Each structure stands twice: as structure tokens, then as C-alpha cells.
Amino acid sequence: VKNLITAIPPDLRQGDENLLSDQDLKNLIAKYDLNEKPAKIFKLKELSKKLISKGEKVLIWSTHLKTIDLITKELSKEGINISKITGKTKLKEREEIKDKFNDSSSNLDAIIAIPQACSESISLHKACHHGIYYDMNYNTSEFLQSLDRIHRVGGSEKNPVFYYFLQYENS
């Protein structure tokens, strides 16, 4: 930080170099998640709660493990029962999550998944008709596979399927 400040002409500095010490800046960065939340998190919570309050189940997609952890924590705070499927999820646990989600009498409201870990052999179309894309990696094959987790030709035409793409304006 100090190197950046010294690159500013002296007459424009006006004592700015004393605003934050290096340690203060490190502390702010370390505590960022405690003080700041992405705007999409608020929209995701609002949308998820609205759908779940109507008795719907929700499938949420994200491509980053840290983001999945943040979303899981934030939705759990809202009372949403959520499970996650990532590359770290063992096959047996994956099957248990899928079976519980597909069971209409279970209290599992949502699954959050990484497309690579949930791309094939997981059918959720009978229980879920709402897919929310928190972020994407723009891999076409993975995207098309993710769409089909809640939509099947010959199996889900009777129920409309809704996809939500959370994006920042002008992105």
C-alpha cells in the first residue's frame, strides 16, 4: 500500500498514507466476509425463501467451493435445510442427498452443487422445478447437463421448469 501511495505526487497525498496501516488493511481483508456480502447472496436468499415457502424445492448451481460454503452458511441461517454436492462429496452421500431431495416427505429444501460433480446420473426432475445459477463457468457441456438435472425429455413436460440466472447489471 505504501508503495502505491508514494507513486502519487506529494501535493495530492495530503496525509493519506496514514489512513490505514498495513496491519489494518490485512485485518480488513481477513474479516471481509464478516462485514461484506455479495448482493447476489441477498437476492438468492430472497428467491429461495419465496420458492420454498410455496412448497417448492430448489437446485442452486455454483462453480466455486468457497462460494458454495458461503451460500450454505447464509441459507442455513435463514432456516433453509440445504445439502451440498461437490467433488468432495462421497458417492454414497451423494446418493443419500439425491434420495432425500426426491422424497416429497423429507425436509431437504435445497441442494447446492458444482456442475462437474452433479452432471450425470442424478435425476431431480420429479421433485424440483427451480434451478438457480448463482455463478457459471461457461462450459457449454456442463451447463447443458446442469439444465437436465431438473428437466427430462419424456419425464417432465407436464411441469414447467424455471431457471434463474443471478447476474450483476451490465455484466
Feature map (PLM): residue ranges:
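Conserved Helicase C-terminal RecA-like lobe
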Residues: 1-118, 122-123
